[in-house]
Amino acid sequence: MPLATETVAERVAALRERVDEVTLATGRERGAVAILAVTKGHPRAAVLAALAAGLHDVGENYLQEAREKYADLPPCARHFIGHVQTNKAKAIVAAFDVVQSVDRLEAGLALAKAADAAGRALRVLVQVNISPTERFGATPEQAPALAEQLRARGLQVDGVMAIGPTDGDPDRAFAAARSVFERVGGTTLSLGMSGDWERAVRAGSTMVRLGTAIFGPRPARERIPA
């Protein structure tokens, strides 16, 4: 059963306060770190509840879910955070405002072509692999050159996204992501999820991707096609 709108609002308010506390402790201003509501596996009502609670950014891993839930939303930024399949680039460009998961030139070229055909600018982040268990992402060494190649194709590269390790030292991995971000440039370091966001903010994250912390566990359901 989806959480009540009031419950989502209470969780968002508590998270916003705590995110700001950690942000202030790093010497940055209140509000410097954005919260992205990850709605994967949750119904459209959850998306609307997050927006009603004052969040501006929502994110999905799967294109099909976004098609079902993200149509005709109130003003917001829709982020694609799943793996980019080149044959779905046109549909991704149509459904999202930001693509956080560009990890190779092939994907970037497909998105740039689709954005050009649609006559629109597309913001993207370079996904960087900082975890030995993560399947996707450019290496830290490859990422700056990839960012320049993407910019040369007309994409608005606004920073870096990374997924922290499930074991090992997250602080070291987060520091590596920040180092890449400083070389790539932009305004967005999308780093940190429900289980590790505080450490990510301390490492310099400017956007945390929170799903369980806002909505609770995802309901059991059949696998959604990408």
Specify the residue positions occupied by each region the protein language model found.
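Conserved alpha/beta-domain cores
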Residues: 1-188, 193-195, 201-203, 215-217
